[in-house]
Amino acid sequence: MKEIRCYKNTPNGLVLVGVIDDYQSFSFTRTYSDCGEWQLTLNGDTKNAKLVKGMNYISMNNGVCGVVEQLENNVGSNNIITYKGSELKGITSSRIVMPPNNSAYLTIKKNPALVILDILNTQLVNCTDRRRIIPNIRIDNSIEVDTTDKIEFNGRFGNVYDEINTIATAYNIGWYATIEPKQSNNQYAEIVFYVYHGIDRSKNQSTNSRFILRYSNDNIEQSDYQYIDTIPNTALVAGKGEGINRKTYIVNDTAIGLNRKEVYIDARDVEDETLLPQRGKEKLAEYGDNNSYQITLSRNLSKQYHSAFELGDIGTIQDDLLGIEIDFRLTEITEVYESDDFRLEVVCGYDKKDLGSAIKRSTSNTETLLKIEGSGSGGGGGGGGGGSTPQPIDPSQILNLVYPIGSLYLSINNVNPSSSLGGTWVRFDPGGKLTYYMWKRTQ
């Protein structure tokens, strides 16, 4: 079985306390933009299990590194110990974005990948308040990016992990943390953060080797396909102001007919109206993709992991049963080790429709603002613009989104809502004794 190296944190650096190669099972989920989890089960009576007692971190290879967050010891006929935790980059969730002294926001105007690196640097390593510094961390800045493609990040009190996840998901950026020998003293180890971009290995490109999944190619053992037609792809973002004077912007206004799925985003906290397009783009990214595949790869293809494909790469799925062909990004890879068995499970596309993500969307209280700049930054936009200047829209579009014809409006006073909302409304009496008035929109 593959060795798992176990580390303890000390003031001088991370210290190797033991190596485990006799575990019962080990599963580790790596994610491109998010943060995965892992679980390790072993017999507590073994010599190795006793050596690693009190460990803080684990490492199997580049990227498969985790922080220990939970320990369970089931003492019965067998003394079973189970360690659980998250990917090593999950340590970022222990910090919030603190602005510099005498500043309302932490402002960074760079390429999205460099923004992530600067957030890591200012909030984990070179903090204004030295009590916030997490020791034994290094940030790798070797990524090559287009410096003309910029966003403006203005962070204030948002969770560091959430902020990075938002940017990484919106801009298809990968990030991870690994354990490496300390540069100043290789007797100790340190945590190193990396930011990277996956490689395009899809069918219709010729620069890189292709990564094509297909049952007839015998590289898929099992698959679970999910398509959801209700994922929003067009966002009406409403900023400051009231009524017809409220600043608004439509992201991806080119979608038409039944292919257009609209969502309203309340962005009244955004002071600068040029930030509205990016707020819409990042919120749309949270809803995930229409297509999502969960696939168990064949054993032969699993052996090519790290050489023929890697987390974050773009490939192509040719599903003969459904008659579809789609390009996808490898957003999640789970390695499962049990005795002498090894399997690889992958997720293609972002699946953000689970309950936890929905709650996060509705309860997020971050005061972070992002502004996109540069011709290559994308993000859609209304009125045919490049995305950085909000275009005026007909206020009736807001009314039709929030209160379509047939909607009911409750009021504690007898005032026709048309005076503030527009449209035509009539009093609606459902019967019974009510302490409020009800209006129904007719046109």
Stretches found by the model and what they are:
Residues 4, 53-62, 312-320:
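Short conserved beta-strand and strand-loop elements enriched in small hydrophobics
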Residues 46-141:
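Surface-exposed cap/loop segments at beta↔alpha junctions
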Residues 1-18, 31, 216, 345, ...:
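Trimeric viral appendage architectures of receptor-binding fibers, tailspike depolymerases
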Residues 31, 40, 85, 102-138, ...:
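Amphipathic, non-transmembrane alpha-helical segments in extracytoplasmic/periplasmic proteins
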Residues 17, 76-77, 83-85, 240-275, ...:
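Acidic, low-complexity/disordered segments
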Residues 11, 104-130, 262-272, 278-288, ...:
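Intrinsically disordered, low-complexity terminal/linker regions enriched in Pro/Ser/Gly
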Residues 70-92, 135-231:
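Short beta-strand-centered interaction patches in the first periplasmic/extracellular domains
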Residues 30-45, 79-91, 167, 237, ...:
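Oligomerization/assembly interface segments of phage tail-like spikes and tubes
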